[in-house]
């Protein structure tokens, strides 16, 4: 996006009724004396909002950054401001995963803005001032380091990108191999906290209805993106550890409880068989997992498929040899 730029400081100033001060730091390889002097304003501020990131200088269509970390001068700026004011929030503008490990524990919060366009300033101001409760979730995994990505060995290969991870694309790769990550697929915080409970599965014939309770245990109205994953317990062929099959954003008022429902069919348990040249569903046991992310599973239940029909079971029977 290369349209009209927005002035986040001006928008925040209007929402807060004045008193917002802004020090502007442009692309520099190191922090200038003027920039260092400007950062001292952090001592006199209630909250500091530090906007950092990449952009067309670092990444774009058909090319990418050489590393996941922010430019060194930006990391230095974050750490210095945070040392002066612990109430520091960092807003990141970037087109992909960013390594925040060098300063994550030094700041009060991180807001990932992506490249949010001409109305991005107004949207970010609404979130930062609490007018809007954020409810977004990551649609990708943030790895701990570049070397953990499955495509690491083929970076900078002209015209060729080899998907050697096979079925384990994206979050499936990290989950199937148990690789620790910085922020998992589906992760996202808000000003609310939610409890998951009371999972019930009504499975009969070709469908399974999955219902559970979602309670907002905070003092702030909010929305939660609930996710449903399926894990095959006795797959006949190689399959990923778990696969996302459904998700829903549920609004729940502070202190209240809502119901979330998903409907699964036998097709949701299927995989593509090269031997049969088509989609097939194997008989066996499957675990239904409900979570706030792929690494934050809150509820589990079992279903059995026999002759293409779904059935709820309490446990997998033990076969004595």
Where are these regions (language model features)?
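Short acidic, flexible loop segments centered on an aromatic residue
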Residues: 219-236, 242-244
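Intrinsically disordered, low-complexity Pro/Gly/Ser/Thr-rich segments with frequent PxxP/GP/PP motifs
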Residues: 236-274
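Glycine/threonine-rich flexible loop motifs
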Residues: 52-71
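Compositionally biased low-complexity segments at domain edges in trafficked proteins
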Residues: 14, 36-53, 315-321
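Secreted, periplasmic, or luminal enzymes acting at the cell surface/secretory milieu
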Residues: 93-223, 229, 254, 282-283, ...
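Loop/turn elements at helix/coil->beta-strand transitions in domains of secreted/extracellular proteins
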Residues: 44-48, 84-89, 106-108, 134-136
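Short, surface-exposed ligand- or partner-binding patches at beta-edge/loop junctions that are enriched
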Residues: 263-294
């Amino acid at each position: 996006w290369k349209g009209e730029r927005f002035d986040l400081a001006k928008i925040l100033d209007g929402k807060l009724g004045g008193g917002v001060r802004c020090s502007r730091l442009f692309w520099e390889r190191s922090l200038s004396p003027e920039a260092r002097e400007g950062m001292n304003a952090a001592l006199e501020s209630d909250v500091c909002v530090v906007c950092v990131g990449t952009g067309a200088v670092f990444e774009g269509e058909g090319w990418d950054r050489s590393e996941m970390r922010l430019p060194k001068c930006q990391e230095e700026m974050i750490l210095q401001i945070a040392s002066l004011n612990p109430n520091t929030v960092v807003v990141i503008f970037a087109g992909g995963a960013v390594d925040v490990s060098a300063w994550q524990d030094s700041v009060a919060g991180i807001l990932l803005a992506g490249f949010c366009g001409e109305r991005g300033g107004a949207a970010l101001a609404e979130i930062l001032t609490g007018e809007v409760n954020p409810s977004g979730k990551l649609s990708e995994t943030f790895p701990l380091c570049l070397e953990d990505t499955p495509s690491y060995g083929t970076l900078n290969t002209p015209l060729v990108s080899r998907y050697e991870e096979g079925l384990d694309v994206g979050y499936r790769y990290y989950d199937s191999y148990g690789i620790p990550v910085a922020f998992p697929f589906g992760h996202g915080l808000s000003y609310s906290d939610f409890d998951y409970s009371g999972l019930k599965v009504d499975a009969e014939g070709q469908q399974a209805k999955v219902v559970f309770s979602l309670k907002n245990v905070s003092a702030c109205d909010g929305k939660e993106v609930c996710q449903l994953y399926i894990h095959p317990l006795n797959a006949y062929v190689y399959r990923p550890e778990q696969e996302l099959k459904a998700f829903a954003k549920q609004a729940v008022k502070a202190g209240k409880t809502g119901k979330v429902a998903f409907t699964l069919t036998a097709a949701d348990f299927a995989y593509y068989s090269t031997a049969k040249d088509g989609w097939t569903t194997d008989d066996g046991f499957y675990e239904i997992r409900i979570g706030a992310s792929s690494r934050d599973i809150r509820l589990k239940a079992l279903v059995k498929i026999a002759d293409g029909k779904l059935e709820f079971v309490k446990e997998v029977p033990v076969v004595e040899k």
